[in-house]
A protein has these predicted regions:
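Short secondary-structure boundary motifs at beta->alpha junctions and helix caps
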Residues: 102-148
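Repetitive helical segments and hydrophobic/amphipathic motifs
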Residues: 11-12
């Protein structure tokens, strides 16, 4: 009698779990913003925070979420630079992968970040719009470098 009751409760529970897992399998993890921790500390004259976070979302490959737990790390972007007196645009973009604490879900700066990628460029005779385009492009390049190296963590 106990086996019949146990199996009648266990089978629907397993089917419900399997259906939930299949429903989540259709959602690409790289687009699921709720599962990612994105931080931005960029120069607002070059790129705003929403644009920087969108660049991260669009360029972190789905394989990252298959290899790493999305709730275990935060991605920090930082874009610095600007136009100098000679109208040369100088941009440095950095993306870091920071582990999160287990209890508070806060990024840990120490020990050092798990991974860091930096991309930089300069463009002579540039405008402020051209400099913003370079900043976005360099942030994309640094994000793709993080994505390609994530399997080595």
């Amino acid at each position: 009698m106990k086996r019949v009751v146990l199996s009648s409760l266990l089978v629907p529970a397993l089917l419900g779990f399997a259906a939930g897992a299949l429903a989540q399998a259709d959602v690409p993890h790289s687009r699921d913003v709720k599962k990612t921790n994105l931080l931005d500390h960029s120069n607002s004259n070059l790129i705003d925070s929403a644009t920087a976070k969108q660049v991260l979302i669009d360029n972190i490959p789905a394989k990252v979420w298959k290899i790493q737990n999305p709730g275990a790390y935060a991605f920090l972007s930082q874009v610095e630079g600007g136009l100098n007196a000679q109208r040369t645009c100088v941009v440095t973009a950095r993306v870091m992968v920071l582990p999160l604490t287990g209890t508070l879900n806060v990024p840990m700066w120490r020990p050092l970040p798990k991974m860091t990628a930096t991309a930089f460029d300069s463009q002579p005779n540039s405008s402020s719009d051209g400099c913003k385009a370079v900043a976005k492009d360099k942030l994309k390049e640094a994000t793709l470098a993080i994505g390609s190296g994530i399997g080595k963590m």
